[in-house]
A protein has these predicted regions:
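Alpha-helical tetratricopeptide repeat
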Residues: 137-145
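Amphipathic alpha-helical repeat scaffolds of TPR domains
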Residues: 26-33, 63-72, 101-117, 148-151, ...
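TPR/TPR-like (Sel1-like) alpha-helical repeat modules
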Residues: 75-95, 154, 159-177
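N-terminal leader/linker segments that initiate helical-solenoid repeat arrays
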Residues: 23-112, 120-121
Length: 214
């Protein structure tokens, strides 16, 4: 009888310990999400990092949510390579495509916007790397961004990198761009050609550009 009582107490203790850990994990994740939502990205990141040992003992469902939040934070902080890694880990841990896909779309838009800025300031080397990231996120859909990455690599005079990208384009049998987009720079009055519909849609929203056309 005593053994049965001891066993029941052990089971109860283990259950309480599990519930306590689970509550603690969810509480820290909620708090980190609050920091993120309020735009306090560094605080959200610090809280996740300081709670690493707590999250390490969690199940994959919690871990996938933690990595998703890491990805969202790094996207907002423009740490794009870290964001990609975090989202990949979240996917591998079982996060649903319904939850992940919108975040990947936001990441793609953020990277493209940053690359557009790099090209405008003639930082072609960084633009090439970022556009390659967009391709890597979804190689089946984003093949055109590998083409843009190669073009930026040429502009940066990194011909070895450009050749690497062009050879990859050949390997995937990229057939080129069919639709051309045009928009006028307000400052110069010059019309420029835009090959990306996403970039075109972003520039249309800018006061620095006018007269968009296809």
């Amino acid at each position: 009888m005593n053994k049965l009582l001891i066993m029941k107490k052990l089971i109860l203790y283990t259950l309480l310990l599990f519930v306590s850990f689970s509550y603690g994990q969810k509480k820290e994740l909620r708090n980190a999400n609050k920091f993120y939502t309020s735009g306090e990205y560094s605080s959200a990141l610090d809280l996740l990092d300081s709670s690493k040992s707590l999250f390490d003992s969690s199940d994959d469902k919690i871990k996938s949510q933690v990595m998703l939040l890491y990805g969202k934070i790094h996207t907002s902080m423009e740490d794009f390579s870290l964001a990609i890694k975090a989202f990949d880990m979240s996917r591998n841990m079982g996060i649903s495509n319904q939850i992940l896909s919108p975040e990947l779309s936001k990441l793609e838009t953020a990277i493209i916007t940053s690359a557009v800025g790099d090209n405008e300031t003639e930082n072609f080397s960084e633009a090439a790397k970022k556009l390659k990231m967009v391709y890597d996120i979804n190689p089946e859909i984003n093949q055109e961004y590998l083409y843009y990455a190669a073009s930026s690599a040429v502009n940066s005079m990194d011909y070895n990198l450009a050749l690497e990208y062009y050879l990859l384009l050949s390997d995937i049998k990229y057939e080129g761009i069919e639709t051309k987009f045009y928009i006028t720079e307000v400052a110069s009055g010059s019309e420029i050609e835009i090959n990306s519909e996403t970039e075109f849609n972003l520039l249309k929203k800018s006061k620095d550009y006018s007269n968009p056309r296809e």
